[in-house]
């Protein structure tokens, strides 16, 4: 699926439409149990739209810039209000995932729910909008027409409210409310539930912001993360964060365009 979508995307880039280049890079130091680790990652892609058709592909560095792998590759079209996408794309499931950029969320770490499921999948996606309501259904697998080898996930939104699921029988489902400052969600995975609240707590002159995340789950465990983010200019930010889950302190620099 990756090679097919990539070859189609390359042909589309040379054939029609305006192309925009987007990407994100981040380098972060983590200190956990007095052990320091450095992680650096770059993602770069080209995306275009022309006469109802959309297409794009992106690559990511692997193993701290030692190698490069395919991150995203898809083609799509708008059929009178029904959007169809084929290839490797971002899954439709939660508010946290919907507001992420190339898999990066507001801070340096993601919620437990976000990290539990693949953010990018291969298959076919159908979606559309009607007023304030929108929906997207993903059929995931090498053969999307084979019910035994494919799975389904999706998301429905009505204003600030959202509902997402994974599996034909809703084995995993989430309900959330979100805005530009954060979200509150409740996710059930075969009876094991997790509640998450994340958001910006304060801002100073649109340059510095403090944020936090709290999780509470079916095991009666509460974890949290707190951080600060300083945006030097559009797309460039320094972030510091403490995550209670591993008692780790992280410092990072991120740029996006």
Model-derived features: positions:
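Gram-negative bacterial Sec-dependent N-terminal signal peptides
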Residues: 1-17
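Outer membrane beta-barrel
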Residues: 13-30, 34-142, 155-159
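Transmembrane beta-barrel strands of outer-membrane/channel proteins
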Residues: 23-29, 57-61, 86-88, 137-141, ...
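Residues that define the transmembrane beta-barrel architecture of outer-membrane proteins
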Residues: 34-42, 67-71, 118-122, 129-131, ...
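Short Gly/Pro-enriched turn/cap motifs at secondary-structure boundaries
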Residues: 113-117, 212, 228
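Detector for outer-membrane/organellar transmembrane beta-barrel domains
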Residues: 132-134, 147-221
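Outer-membrane beta-barrel "beta-signal"
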Residues: 158, 226-232, 244-257
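C-terminal beta-signal and adjacent terminal beta-strands/loops
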Residues: 234-236
